């Protein structure tokens, strides 16, 4: 039987603090036998404005957030479903809210970009 963990956490405006909290919870899940753990949407940052997300957005396959996810997955031998990670969209002025699945070898094996069909003011 395989064990999956669903992580619940309250994200703060500090990305480093949120990554530390997420690591602690992922580590606990792995120690309890989980082989896969899902982090919540906005686990990295609960910003006050859209600009907050732009300030931490990364290019696909590059940046400290994605490096942290890969390293954490390898270190804990854990598949991670990474809630949402703000990624830059080439040639566009918007971000992708990317749900990334990282295997225990630290490789992104799939990604889903959340899209909104309308904007609300």
Feature roles, as predicted:
Residues 1-5:
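Extreme N-terminal starter segment of soluble prokaryotic enzymes
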Residues 15, 24-105, 109-111, 119-120:
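Cys-nucleophile CN-hydrolase/nitrilase-fold catalytic domain and related Cys-dependent amidase chemistry
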């Amino acid at each position: 039987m395989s064990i999956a963990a669903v992580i619940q956490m309250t994200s703060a405006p500090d990305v480093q603090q949120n990554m530390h909290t997420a690591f602690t919870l992922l580590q606990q899940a792995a120690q309890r036998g989980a082989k896969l753990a899902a982090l919540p949407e906005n686990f990295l940052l609960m910003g006050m404005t859209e600009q907050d997300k732009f300030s931490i957005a990364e290019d696909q396959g590059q940046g400290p957030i994605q490096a942290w996810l890969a390293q954490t997955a390898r270190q804990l031998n854990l598949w991670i479903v990474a809630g949402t990670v703000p990624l830059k969209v080439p040639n566009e002025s918007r971000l992708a809210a990317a749900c990334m699945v990282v295997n225990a070898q630290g490789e992104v094996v799939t990604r889903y970009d959340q899209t909104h069909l309308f904007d609300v003011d």
